C-alpha cells in the first residue's frame, strides 16, 4: 500500500509530506495508482525546489519521497501542497485498497533534517 502522510502546523497549513510504499495492484512500472501518486507528489517536490526555490529537507529516491520546509509555509507553498493533497485524495477515493492518505500534525519542527544528502534535480 502507498502511504501518503501530509504534515500540518497548528493552523492547518501544510509544512511537508512523506510518500512511501507500493500499491501492489500491478507490477512496478505498470501500476496506475503508483504512477498517479508519484506524479502529483514529484511535481510538488520539483515545484517547491525549482520554481519556488524554497529551502527544505527531503529525501528523493528508492520508492520514497519526503519534504519538510525549512521555513513556515506561505501562500505559494500552500497552493502547491493543496494541489498535491487534492490529487492524492482523489486517487485514494477510487483505490482505497492501494492508497492511504494521512493528514496529521507535524512532529518535526520546521527545518528538522530528514536527509541532508539531497540529490540534484535536473
Q: Over which residues does each language-model region extend?
A:
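N-terminal intrinsically disordered, cationic/polar leader segments
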Residues: 1-32, 42, 46-122
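Short, conserved glycine- and acidic-residue-centered signature motifs
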Residues: 33-37
Amino acid at each position: 500500500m502507498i502511504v501518503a502522510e501530509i504534515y500540518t502546523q497548528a493552523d492547518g497549513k501544510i509544512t511537508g509530506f512523506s510518500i512511501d510504499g507500493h500499491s501492489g495492484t500491478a507490477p512496478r512500472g505498470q501500476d496506475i495508482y503508483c504512477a498517479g501518486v508519484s506524479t502529483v507528489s514529484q511535481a510538488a517536490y520539483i515545484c517547491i525546489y525549482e520554481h519556488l526555490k524554497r529551502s527544505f529537507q527531503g529525501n528523493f529516491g528508492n520508492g520514497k519521497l519526503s519534504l519538510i520546509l525549512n521555513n513556515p509555509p506561505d501562500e505559494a507553498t500552500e497552493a502547491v501542497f493543496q494541489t498535491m493533497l487534492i490529487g492524492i485524495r482523489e486517487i485514494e477515493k477510487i483505490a482505497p485498497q492501494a492508497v492511504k492518505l494521512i493528514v496529521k500534525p507535524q512532529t518535526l519542527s520546521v527545518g528538522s533534517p530528514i536527509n541532508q544528502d539531497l540529490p540534484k534535480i535536473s
